[in-house]
Amino acid sequence: DNIRLHDDDARRLLPRLTPGLIGRVYLLYSDPWPKKRHWNRRFVQRDTLDQLARILAPGGLFRFATDHMGHARWALGLAANHPDFQWTAQGPEDWRTRWADGYPTRYEEKGLAGPHRVYLEFRRRGG
């Protein structure tokens, strides 16, 4: 029932958070860094997923939304193969359908005009 907002690079904040404290993390329409030479700037990286796994409670959710298919493939490839996360999708409609309890952003509204919208959800294993 508590909420905190951090208006800066979350990667700086993650190491300071208490392990197992967070129930849900949203990454909504982050910069896809489409040029290959910039992929190291993407938020979803192995070390970032390690930090998310550390702070998420067992059964906690990491939700990722994008309108960039390359970015979606990148995040899916890393998170689905991470030992601490399980992709929750049961079928194609699961990743095409926005979460019922989601929060729209201005970038999502912009993305709705395009052909691609991807909503990925990963559950923290354990517990």
Predicted regions and their residues:
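A short glycine-rich, Lys/Arg-flanked "PGG" loop and its adjoining helix->strand segment in the class I
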Residues: R42-L61
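Class I S-adenosyl-L-methionine
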Residues: H71, G77, N81-G127
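Short catalytic/ligand-binding loop motif for oxyanion handling, primarily in non-cytosolic enzymes
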Residues: P34-K36, H71-W74
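A short SAM/SAH-binding and catalytic strip from SAM-dependent methyltransferases
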Residues: I22-F43
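S-adenosyl-L-methionine
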Residues: D1-G23
